Amino acid sequence: VTPPSPGEPQRRVTAHLVTGSTVLGGRVLFGQDPAEVVRDLGGLSPNTSLRAVDVLTELVEAPDGTPLHIDRVVFAEAGTRAAWPSAAAGSGLSPSPTELAAGEDLPQDRPRLRRFASYGIVDGPDGRVLLSRIAEGFPGAGTWHLPGGGVDAGEDVRAALRREVAEETGQDGQVGDLLTVSSHHRGQPGGHEIYAVWVFFHVFVASPRPARVLEENGSTADSGWFTPEEVAGLRLSATAQRGLAYMARHSRP
């Protein structure tokens, strides 16, 4: 896994299952699906439906002085009531920073890239959806993508999304509910192995402006507002397909 730059915190991801007033937790290792980690923690069947409850950003130091950036992803069984966030009050969540201080012992056979990314299903008062187009030279070049991207070391997951929306589209969005959590893991023989955890939030832009890219020499070539009918005719990135498919399944008729 690519090591952090000098002075940057070590990155960790944990997954948690809220059952009533109890919170179970486990470390998410490279390549693991957070939802599968949670099902294993709770002794649930592989087909058990889960709902994403929350994502927490924790910036701490381990007892040995190691700075840690922990992204904690919280789930509950679909259709159940969960005492969140009161279930997390008082004692800290497990695994603790002490338990997370050690790095992973991964094979050294290839470069590995790990990413925790936050994306928005962004809309405005008229129901149009905000998308950004990936620039040439980046994975998925030319496809339309959800505004968002990697969470920087030391950055809160929601603050990162609001920043990305502003940089990629010129909009001031309010980050709302967590919608779903997904993971992506792929590798090529002799090439990099890439692993990412994607979290998707609803973002509302109360006062939409014409979309324009503010970042320079970045991964975004263009951005724009689209009706749902127009979105159906666009070539979408894998991330956008996954996030918009979730919305299509869960939107009210």
Per-region residue spans from a language model:
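A generic structural micro-feature
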Residues: 64-70, 110-114, 143, 191-197, ...
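N-terminal strand-loop-strand
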Residues: 1-29, 104-144, 173, 177
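Acidic, metal-coordinating catalytic segment for phosphate/diphosphate chemistry
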Residues: 1-9, 58-121
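Short, well-ordered beta-strand micro-motif
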Residues: 74-76, 122, 200-204, 224-227
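Phosphate/ribose-recognition catalytic cores of enzymes acting on nucleotide-derived substrates
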Residues: 194-209
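A generic structural signal for short hydrophobic patches within well-formed alpha-helices
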Residues: 231-232
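Ordered, small/hydrophobic-rich secondary-structure cores
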Residues: 1-67
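The catalytic Nudix box helix
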Residues: 27-51, 146-179
